[in-house]
């Protein structure tokens, strides 16, 4: 029956709507009718739970959004027209998918961001369509609660709170946690917003990290091994998304506070010529808050392996003795092997330092006459010695110097030897000198004798007192034994070095008591003792420790140097003052060419504390000074290397000066970069001049020794004395020695003369000079000189040619008045020969004059005949023409002929006459006459333009 009744509803509604009268009554009728039709409200669930994925618009509801209406299937009244959401600015909307079924959908108006809001709660209601299409009286359902959760998407990577982390750890400790790093994630869900893991990206580091970001060390850290570690750490969220950027963790290793010196460098480079250079400009002492009351610092420069104990001048012993002002008469018992000093030829030698090494199997005999038999009651023995513990039998004597019987007997007259690390000097007087029990053996017991280091020994004898100086310090003998004098005999004595000669009491004379060690500069000076000043100079080191600005050391600082300045002791009670004092300690090497290499450096410290049972210990500073290689000088000798002199000049009292213009120049190569920075050309070397000393120059005779019966080299002793140089002269040449400047040696060489009072059989003599610095360490080039002797029949020709020889441009012409006068004097001939020459010359003058007259007439005719032809030709303008004539070639041309030769002969005759009569014409006029006579006519005019201007040329 209900469906039958419902079919009338539209009709009734139409009738009701269609009636136009009634006004309010009609409206009320419609409501009554609608109430009869739309009896029920829509129905929905009381609550909904929805999920929406962020960045999406679909909401999945549980249960689904469906509204029911009991008025169904009545049109409009039983249909669902809308779902309404109650709330402010909610990003959701509900739409009806099917009015009849009441199915709806909840969706987002715009993308949902979980990071802004994770969940939403709001009210929703369903509305039916009312009673008709134009009805607004819709019925609504009850309010249902909708709760929506936003589902997160892992769109953000973890980020660390700090871009970098820094921590400081103490070496030698294991930490549970050095520091903690922390990362965050901006995702909203626990799954994606939480950090699940941390990881160290840097490999091979002694660190680990846990899931909470705590970093710990896996092993004990050492400050000496590595001062600082830098590691990279990353983080992962629970979705395993890594951090966008790793963070840097810097771990500084702090050393355990150890007392010691800080801020010093192990290698210190020293450039030669740098003067006094600070060794530790920034050093300071760390005491770790120790209660220090006083401090003693010992700085030691170890140079035992440089030369003979330190960097000393390497000049020869003679040069050093001269340089230090030692008395003359010193005899070198270990000279460099040479023809004159051949007794050291068989010894082992280090040529660079002239150090002789004795291996216990060799000795050297000093020839008779080198050392006088009677040394007198005053004499001095000096030597450098390096000696270690005696090998083999300890009782064996090791002889340094020995004077014993050559044959028959085995008496030792005087000797110097080492026995059981004791230095012993034996001196036995003869009966003719003393006849009483006198001191004979002097013993010194010193640790340095067997320490395998170089030491300088001086034994001063003023009998019966004998004093030993070692490294400048004085030592008296700890034991002196007496003995009777030696009985007189006629047995010759043998002086030996490195062993003692055993001439008697054996089947065959031989060496005995061999020395094991090294010796250098072994000398003896009979008749005089050396002063303390000379001894100090001879053993002085040229390198050592120094203090810059002594006045600024500060109060309370005491310091002390040893004699060689290799050890410096400083004491003080204020650490700040001690620091400043040690910062001023420097190294100095005064040699221009020091020995390159390493010098060990040690700084030891002794600390006293305030009443503490245990005081801090400060480790030694172990460093070294590297002395760099000095610039190598190049010594060059230059000057005139060939000249002629007349024989008469060689016979004169002054002789011939050999090296009037010699120059000694020392240069070094300096590398310069090209001026253009962009160029790729190699660097060029530029020679720069430098000044330094020389220690000898040898003038050697080449081609046979000098014959002392007719020739010699001479040099005034005053020239040497005023320049503090010495010289030795022999038939092989002249040797100048002594430490002096290059200019001093130049001045001395300028005065070397050669004389030959029988030059008739000699054509030329050749000489060679070679100079040295530092005992041959640097040598010059070999400068060769040839001196030719002009005999009387060669003087005229040689004079004419000699003045045309042009010296090299870097040489200065040196004119010697004595040379010119000698040449003129040599031209004088005996009176009878002069008369004959005058007569001959007169005849030649007449013949030459006639010949010249005829030649001039012939030339004049020739000029007149050819003048017309020349006018038609192009004139040759030779006003600016310069013709250079080789002065070593012949001057005769095709147009000169015999007339010119005759003119020259006439000229020479006139010169001889002028010389014999004492005429003193100038050199310039003579040269012009010699070049210009005999040229006439056109050739004469042309010769005026081609004249050789030799007014400035030396003879």
Swiss-Prot record:
Gene3D superfamilies: 2.60.120.200, Cadherins
Cellular component per GO, a single term: dendrite
Domain Cadherin intervals: 44-160, 161-280
Region (Disordered): 887-955
Reported modifications of this chain: Proteolytically processed under normal cellular conditions. A primary zeta-cleavage generates a large extracellular (soluble) N-terminal domain (sAlc) and a short C-terminal transmembrane fragment (CTF1). A secondary cleavage catalyzed by gamma-secretase within the transmembrane domain releases the beta-Alc-gamma chain in the extracellular milieu and produces an intracellular fragment (AlcICD). This processing is strongly suppressed in the tripartite complex formed with APBA2 and APP, which seems to prevent the association with PSEN1.
UniProt main location, coarse: membrane
Membrane-spanning parts: 832-852
Protein name in the entry: Calsyntenin-2
Name of the gene this protein is made from: CLSTN2
Family membership noted in the UniProt record: Belongs to the calsyntenin family.
Function of the molecule: Postsynaptic adhesion molecule that binds to presynaptic neurexins to mediate synapse formation, and which is involved in learning and memory. Promotes synapse development by acting as a cell adhesion molecule at the postsynaptic membrane, which associates with neurexin-alpha at the presynaptic membrane.
Keyword entries, A-Z: Calcium, Cell adhesion, Cell membrane, Cell projection, Endoplasmic reticulum, Glycoprotein, Golgi apparatus, Membrane, Postsynaptic cell membrane, Repeat, Signal, Synapse, Transmembrane, Transmembrane helix
Single GO molecular function: calcium ion binding
A Pfam family recorded for this sequence: CLSTN_C
CDD domains cross-referenced by the UniProt entry: Cadherin_repeat
Effect of residue 193 to I: In a colorectal cancer sample; somatic mutation
One of the GO BP terms on file: positive regulation of synaptic transmission
The record's note on its domains: Binds synaptic Ca(2+) with its cytoplasmic domain.
């Amino acid at each position: 029956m209900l469906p039958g009744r419902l079919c009338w509803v539209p009709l009734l509604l139409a009738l009701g709507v269609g009636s136009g009268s009634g006004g309010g009554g009609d409206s009320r009728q419609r409501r009554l009718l609608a109430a009869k039709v739309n009896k029920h409200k829509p129905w929905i669930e009381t609550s909904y739970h929805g999920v929406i994925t962020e960045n999406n618009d679909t909401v999945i509801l549980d249960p689904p959004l469906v509204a029911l209406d009991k008025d169904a299937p009545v049109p409009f009244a039983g249909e669902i027209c809308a779902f309404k959401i109650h709330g402010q600015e909610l990003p959701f909307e509900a739409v009806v998918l099917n009015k009849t079924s009441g199915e709806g959908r909840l969706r987002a108006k715009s993308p949902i961001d979980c990071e802004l809001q994770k969940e939403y709660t709001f009210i929703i209601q369903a509305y039916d369509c009312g009673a008709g299409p134009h009805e607004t009286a819709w019925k609504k359902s009850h309010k249902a609660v909708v709760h929506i959760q936003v589902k997160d998407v892992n769109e953000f990577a973890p980020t660390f709170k700090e871009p970098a982390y820094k921590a400081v750890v103490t070496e030698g400790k294991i930490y549970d946690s050095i520091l903690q790093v922390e990362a965050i994630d901006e995702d909203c869900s626990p799954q994606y917003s939480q950090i699940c893991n941390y990881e160290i990206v840097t490999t091979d580091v002694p660190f680990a990290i846990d899931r909470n970001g705590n970093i710990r060390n896996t092993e004990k850290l050492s400050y000496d091994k590595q001062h600082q570690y830098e590691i990279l750490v990353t983080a992962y969220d629970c979705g395993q998304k890594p951090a966008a950027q790793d963070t840097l963790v810097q771990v500084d290793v702090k050393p355990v506070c150890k007392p010691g010196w800080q801020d010093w460098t192990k290698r210190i480079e020293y450039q030669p010529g740098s003067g006094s250079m600070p060794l530790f400009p920034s050093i300071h002492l760390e005491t770790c808050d120790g209660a220090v009351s006083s401090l003693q610092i010992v700085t030691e420069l170890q140079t035992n392996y440089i030369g003979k104990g330190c960097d000393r001048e390497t000049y020869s012993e003679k040069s050093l003795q001269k340089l230090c002002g030692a008395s003359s008469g010193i005899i070198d018992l270990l000279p460099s092997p040479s023809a004159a000093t051949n007794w050291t030829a068989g010894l082992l030698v280090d040529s660079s330092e002239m150090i002789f090494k004795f291996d216990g199997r060799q000795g050297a005999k000093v020839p008779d006459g080198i050392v006088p038999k009677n040394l007198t009651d005053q004499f001095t023995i000096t030597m450098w010695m390096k000696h270690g513990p005696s090998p083999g039998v300890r009782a064996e004597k090791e002889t340094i110097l020995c004077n014993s019987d050559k044959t028959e007997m085995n008496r030792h007259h005087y000797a110097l030897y080492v026995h059981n690390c004791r230095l012993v000097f034996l001196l036995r007087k003869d009966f003719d000198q003393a006849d009483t029990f006198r001191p004979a053996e002097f013993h010194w017991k010193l640790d340095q004798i067997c320490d395998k280091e170089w030491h300088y020994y001086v034994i001063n004898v003023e009998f019966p007192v004998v004093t030993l100086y070692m490294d400048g310090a004085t030592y008296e003998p700890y034991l002196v034994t007496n003995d009777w004098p030696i009985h007189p005999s006629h047995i010759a004595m043998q002086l030996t070095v490195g062993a003692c000669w055993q001439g008697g009491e054996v089947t065959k004379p031989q060496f005995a008591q061999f020395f094991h060690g090294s010796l250098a500069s072994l000398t003896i000076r009979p008749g005089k003792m050396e002063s303390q000043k000379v001894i100090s100079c001879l053993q002085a080191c040229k390198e050592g420790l120094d203090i810059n600005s002594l006045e600024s050391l500060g109060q309370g600082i005491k310091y002390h140097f040893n004699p060689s300045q290799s050890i410096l002791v400083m004491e003080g009670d204020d650490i700040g003052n001690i620091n400043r004092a040690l910062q001023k300690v420097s190294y100095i090497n005064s040699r221009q060419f020091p020995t390159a290499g390493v010098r060990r450096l040690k700084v030891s410290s002794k600390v006293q504390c305030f009443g503490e049972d245990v005081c801090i210990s400060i480790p030694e500073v172990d460093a070294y000074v590297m002395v760099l290689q000095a610039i190598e000088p190049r010594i060059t000798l230059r000057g005139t290397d060939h000249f002629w002199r007349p024989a008469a000049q060689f016979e004169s009292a002054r002789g011939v000066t050999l090296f009037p213009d010699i120059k000694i120049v020392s240069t070094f190569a300096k590398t310069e970069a090209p001026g253009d920075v962009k160029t790729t050309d190699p660097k060029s070397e530029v020679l720069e001049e430098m000044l330094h000393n020389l220690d000898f120059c040898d003038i050697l005779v080449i081609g046979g020794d000098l014959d002392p019966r007719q020739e010699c080299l001479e040099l005034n002793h005053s020239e040497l004395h005023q320049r503090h140089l010495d010289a030795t002269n022999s038939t092989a040449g002249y040797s100048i020695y002594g430490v002096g400047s290059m200019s001093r040696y130049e001045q001395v060489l300028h005065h070397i003369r050669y004389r030959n009072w029988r030059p008739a059989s000699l054509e030329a003599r050749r000489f060679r000079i070679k100079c040295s610095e530092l005992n041959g360490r640097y040598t010059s080039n070999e400068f060769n000189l040839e001196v030719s002797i002009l005999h009387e029949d060669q003087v005229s020709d040689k004079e004419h040619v000699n003045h045309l020889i042009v010296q090299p441009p870097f040489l200065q012409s040196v004119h010697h008045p004595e040379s010119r006068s000698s040449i003129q004097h040599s031209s004088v001939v005996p009176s009878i020969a002069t008369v004959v020459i005058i007569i001959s010359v007169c005849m030649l003058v007449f013949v030459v004059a006639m010949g010249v007259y005829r030649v001039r007439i012939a030339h004049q005719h020739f000029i007149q005949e050819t003048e017309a032809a020349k006018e038609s030709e192009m004139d040759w303008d030779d006003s600016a023409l310069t013709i250079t004539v080789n002065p070593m070639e012949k001057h005769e041309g095709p147009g000169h002929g015999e007339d010119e030769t005759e003119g020259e002969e006439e000229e020479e005759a006139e010169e001889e006459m002028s010389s014999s009569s004492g005429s003193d014409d100038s050199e310039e006029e003579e040269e012009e006459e010699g070049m210009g006579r005999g040229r006439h006519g056109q050739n004469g005019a042309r010769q005026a333009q081609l004249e050789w201007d030799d007014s400035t040329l030396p003879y």
